[in-house]
Amino acid sequence: VIPFYALARWLVWAVVATLFGFRTVGRENVPLTGPLIVACNHVSNLDPPCLGVGMPRQVTYMAKKELFEIPVLGRLIRWLGAFPVDRSRGDIASIKTAIGVLERGTCLGIFPEGGRNVDGTKQAQMGVALLASLSGATVVPAYLSGTKKTKFRSQVTVVFGEPLRFEAGQKARRDDLAKWTEELMRRIYALREITGGN
């Protein structure tokens, strides 16, 4: 674990736990070693740090490139191991970077809907299925609640579901990726019930 990451994780936990309360469910579903993708719903800018706090291992995030252009924030998220992705086009460089992260046996955090899905209308992209298929990484679905409308002593909850695998290698067809993506999102939103439907 990067020392700065460990410090930042502790600080975020302290703030979130104090102001809102923080609960984690299903941490036993997260493999502690090996290539891993954690795929989560996304409704708030608080989601990446809160997901990181709930995870029992360090998470490297793919983040939209615009964030890296913000002077202080861009430098901070680079220190935390994040790397940029251009959402306006097929970003081959970021895909190669993501596969490299997974080939090192580390954990990659992705929000399949490609950005904040506040009103529930965004359709999930097939990036998680593609990366999992090419790398052989395990995928753990996750659901975050309580970050959309935070107020003092409201509770933030992150739930981790049972891991799954998409194994087709270079032979994965678009239909396969679409099917796997649909199954992944079904599993992510099925976890909502555990949070109380928030």
Q: Which functions belong to the PLM regions below?
A:
Residues I2-W10, A17-T18, V30-R89, T97:
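Catalytic core of membrane glycerolipid acyltransferases/transacylases, capturing the structured
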Residues A17-V25:
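Short gly/ser/thr-rich secondary-structure transition/capping motifs
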Residues P3-F4, A93-N198:
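Non-catalytic C-terminal accessory region of glycerolipid acyltransferases
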Residues T24, Y61, A82-P84, V139, ...:
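Conserved beta-strand scaffold positions in the cores of enzyme catalytic domains, especially
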Residues E28-P31, T150-K151:
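A short beta-turn/loop motif at secondary-structure boundaries
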Residues W13-V16, Y189:
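Amphipathic, well-packed alpha-helical segments that form the structural scaffold of globular domains
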Residues F22, V59, L108:
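Hydrophobic anchor at the start of a short beta-strand
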